[in-house]
């Protein structure tokens, strides 16, 4: 995955999670994602799979399309 895309997605996940008032612990429980993996996602160093995107987006109240909107 392109480094720029990982950075944008990571920022978007972190900002949206914080805006919703969801702690990292609660987000990890809701998605089944480990805390170290969430940390890597949010700092833009993790590679995303579609499976992970389909876990993250609903936990943020979004569709995968909305999560990826504007990223080329």
Q: For each predicted feature, which ranges?
A:
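Residue-level detection of the helix-turn-helix DNA-binding "recognition helix"
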Residues: 18, 32, 43, 72
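Short alpha-helical DNA-recognition segment
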Residues: 21-40
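Base-recognition residues in the alpha-helical recognition helix of bacterial helix-turn-helix
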Residues: 35-40, 51-54, 69
